[in-house]
Amino acid sequence: ALNPAFINIQSVAGSSAFEGEINEAKESFEKSDRVEYYRITTWKRAILRKIFDNSYDQIRHDKSLTTWIERNEWAKPYCVYCTLKQQNNEASWKDWSDYRDPDAEQVGKLWTKFRKDCLYHAWMQYVAEMQFCTAVSEVSQMGLHIKGDIPILINEDSADVWADRKYFSLADRAGAPPDMFSYAGQNWGFPTYRWDVIEKDNFSWWRKRLAQASKFYHAYRIDHVLGFFRIWTIPEKEVTGILGHFEPSVPLTWDVLHGAGFCRQSLEYLRNPNYSVDQLRGFLGDDTERLVAKCFENLPGTTDRFILRDEYSSEKQILAMEEPQAVKDAMLRVYWNRVFIPTGSDDVFYPYWYWYNQPVLYTLPQNEQDKLHDIIHANEHAQNALWEQNAMKLLSVLANETDMLVCAEDLGAVPPCVPTVLNKLNILSLRIERWARNWNMQYSPYYDMEEYPRLSVCTTSCHDTSTLRGLWKEPDFDRNLYWAHAHQMG
């Protein structure tokens, strides 16, 4: 769906009846030093509703609109969703009292029940699409091409997730693992895909998404292309990204760990540690006795070992405690202290990101610590082939579905399989000049542009950076190094 905020109101049939109101609003908006997005979008939707209501008899009998709705099967679920969302004061569908999990038949009945309001949303989409297609046609005649963006993920509170629930895992969230900029990683809040279900439907949801985009774009960028290789997956109950794992990935198994001498009890201890009061004092300090009584219970069969109560078994629950932030931080350190993250299976184990420096690891004999180091490091090297296979399957669909030129956002640290797959599928890579440097050498020299992949989009900046002029003015920017690089390139 398109954003009605970009509709040219004065070009909409029937707008002349409200010419004075439109001109007055336009003059008011143009006086502002900034684009008042919320105010403008609210006004546009309101004036579009006035135009729609005033022209309703003509609109509901418009054969072109009727045909457009029939050809775009996403339109009815989307319009029903928008109508219900308005009726529920824009609340998430998860908070609605009715219609939270509809099937196709129910969507059809709701379209009929709320036909006028649904038709209003369909009409806005039709108008927006016609205007966009006209603009693309005019630009094409000038010899220019339009490049769009295809985000890999979808907001949970969306028509797609509401209507096509089977394609999404609401028990998980996508994000990014910890790095030098974020100790706890990132939790983006978007549900992950159930790729097995999507594949059973011959990737129809993705094919339709690309077909819609191809109406407007000559080329498109795959945002976070690494997510088609593997996505950092976090349980929905968590807040940060620290307790995630890559999906898909080759897990450690009970057979491997048992073969190395680890028993069930030891592995459970490494996944869900238990503590003595003295050990907890190392985390909780002067609050130990109070917090043990409040947040912990005895390990079954013991009187002197403690585990977290179920009420404090997630980041959300810990951060919701009515305690000072310092206490919450200490409780999080207890919660994060593990070698393996919970998986819901006794036979599958994913290492915690910081497994190698956790206090629980150091309670093991040195020989067992060494075994775990060897096993986990070997497992890390086993992932590349799986990720290459997964990306080839998924990206082949995207690359071959339309005639749009495909570009990838492959910035940052990428697995070795990424350039291999992009080259095989003729998907363009991305190079941002200021970041295309050899960071392992003294002064981090810029790469010669002749070293960039032949199939790549090269630019001095992007939406995540300042402009080139802005970069030049940054106080810590090495102008001499960049100037030498620029002159070397001619």
Model regions: which residues?
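Catalytic cores of glycan-processing enzymes that make or break glycosidic bonds
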Residues: 1-490
